[in-house]
C-alpha cells in the first residue's frame, strides 16, 4: 500500500508540473527571418499568392504585441496589437487603410485584419487571418486571405536570429 501511495504521489506531482507548462502561452519576441525552403512555394517571387514579410521584429508583453514586417523594396508594415482582441489601426503604406485585432489562443497567436483601398475597379476589401505558432527557434505563420468570397491559405516559416 505504501508503494502505491508513493507512486500515485509522484505521478500527481509530475502531472501537476506539466499542466502549467502545456498551457503556457508562446513567447513570440525576437527577430525572425523567412525560411523559403520550409515555406509554401507560392509566397515568393514577383506575384506571390499571399505576401509575407522577409523579416519580422516582434516585441511581446503580457498586454500587447508589436510587429514590424520588412521586405526588400517594400515599405515596412507595423502594428501594435492588444492581446485582449481590441481593434487597432495598422500602419500601412499610403492609400491603404488597415485595422486588426489579436488574441492568444493557448500557445497560438491569432491575428485578424481587414485591409481596404481604392482601385480603378472600385473599392477593394481584403480580410486576413494569421495563426502563429512557435516550436523552439521556428515560427510558423499560416495566413488566409479572403477577397470577394475567394480564399487562399499559405504558410511561412521563420527562423529566429
Model-based region annotation:
Residues 1-8:
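Bacterial N-terminal signal peptides that target proteins for export
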Residues 20-161:
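Hydrophobic small-molecule pocket/channel-lining residues, especially in calycin-type beta-barrels
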Residues 8-9, 149:
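A periodicity- and composition-biased signal for non-globular, repetitive helical segments
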Amino acid at each position: 500500500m505504501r508503494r502505491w501511495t508513493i507512486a500515485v504521489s509522484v505521478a500527481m506531482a509530475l502531472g501537476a508540473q506539466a499542466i502549467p507548462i502545456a498551457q503556457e502561452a508562446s513567447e513570440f519576441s525576437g527577430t525572425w527571418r523567412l525560411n523559403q525552403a520550409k515555406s509554401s512555394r507560392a509566397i515568393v517571387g514577383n506575384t506571390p499568392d499571399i505576401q509575407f514579410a522577409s523579416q519580422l521584429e516582434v516585441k511581446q508583453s503580457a498586454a500587447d504585441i508589436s510587429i514590424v514586417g520588412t521586405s526588400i523594396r517594400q515599405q515596412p508594415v507595423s502594428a501594435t496589437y492588444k492581446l485582449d482582441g481590441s481593434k487597432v489601426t495598422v500602419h500601412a503604406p499610403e492609400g491603404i487603410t488597415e485595422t486588426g485585432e489579436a488574441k492568444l489562443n493557448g500557445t497560438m497567436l491569432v491575428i485578424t485584419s481587414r485591409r481596404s483601398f481604392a482601385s480603378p475597379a472600385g473599392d477593394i476589401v481584403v480580410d486576413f487571418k494569421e495563426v502563429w505558432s512557435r516550436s523552439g527557434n521556428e515560427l510558423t505563420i499560416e495566413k488566409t486571405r479572403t477577397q470577394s468570397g475567394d480564399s487562399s491559405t499559405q504558410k511561412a516559416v521563420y527562423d529566429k536570429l
